[in-house]
């Protein structure tokens, strides 16, 4: 791609803004790139993008990054739409976006959509286990002890954070949540 369709350059520009601490501008630049990309994609059918192609991989990164941005500001409807588009374009789910999409579905009480997605939530992912634990709690009002035990045994850092009485907001936390893969 060239010009505004060179998503490698646009991703690099976003990353530069993030490094400079210009987060709002980075989010806006990423969203603008997403809008340009979405205008290229057909409306009726999925257009898988090739991960091996640098511009396609950068385009997928833009979709995921913008979805995360919208999730962070609480625009879950936009985040869901972007994540659904991402899964259509990246059927191998290189970003494990299914986990964030499942979390959005739970937050928005989209239970049918969540149920359809649970097949793809792996016990190997701490995010997926936390999402399943949260969904079970939202539905029943009780903590699923089996999922809690799974979290404790396989994803101890997640378990410890869940059970912690305090959640300090330190530099390491801020770096983590401002990264592409928080």
Task: Give each language-model segment a name.
Residues 12, 16, 62, 69, ...:
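Residue-level signature for tetratricopeptide repeat
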Residues 134-182:
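Long, ordered, amphipathic alpha-helical scaffolds
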Residues 38-39, 85, 91, 126, ...:
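Helix-capping and short linker residues that terminate individual alpha-solenoid repeat units
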Residues 76, 80-119, 128-131:
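Hydrophobic, aromatic-enriched interface-forming segments
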Residues 1-3, 32-56, 87-89:
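Flexible helix-coil transition and linker loops at the boundaries of alpha-helical arrays
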Residues 20, 73, 107-108, 139-141:
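Structural motif corresponding to the intra-repeat A-B loop/turn of tetratricopeptide repeats
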Residues 4-7, 54-63, 90-98, 123-131:
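Generic helix N-cap/helix-start motif at coil->alpha-helix transitions
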Residues 1, 26-33, 76-84, 110-122, ...:
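Alpha-helical repeat scaffolds
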């Amino acid at each position: 791609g060239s010009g505004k369709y060179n998503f490698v350059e646009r991703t690099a520009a976003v990353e530069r803004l993030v490094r400079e601490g210009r987060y709002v501008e980075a989010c806006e630049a990423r969203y603008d790139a997403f809008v340009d990309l979405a205008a290229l994609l057909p409306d009726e059918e999925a257009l898988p993008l090739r991960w091996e192609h640098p511009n396609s991989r950068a385009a997928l990164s833009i979709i995921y990054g913008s979805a995360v941005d919208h999730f962070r500001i609480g625009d879950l409807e936009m985040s869901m739409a972007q994540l659904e588009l991402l899964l259509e374009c990246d059927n191998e789910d290189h970003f494990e976006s299914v986990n964030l999409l499942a979390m959005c579905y739970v937050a928005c009480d989209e239970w049918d959509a969540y149920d359809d997605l649970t097949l793809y939530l792996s016990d190997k992912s701490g995010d997926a286990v936390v999402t399943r634990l949260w969904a079970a709690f939202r539905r029943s009002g009780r903590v699923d002890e089996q999922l809690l035990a799974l979290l404790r045994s396989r994803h101890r850092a997640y378990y410890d954070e869940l059970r912690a009485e305090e959640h300090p907001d330190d530099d390491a936390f801020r770096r983590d949540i401002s990264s592409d893969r928080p």
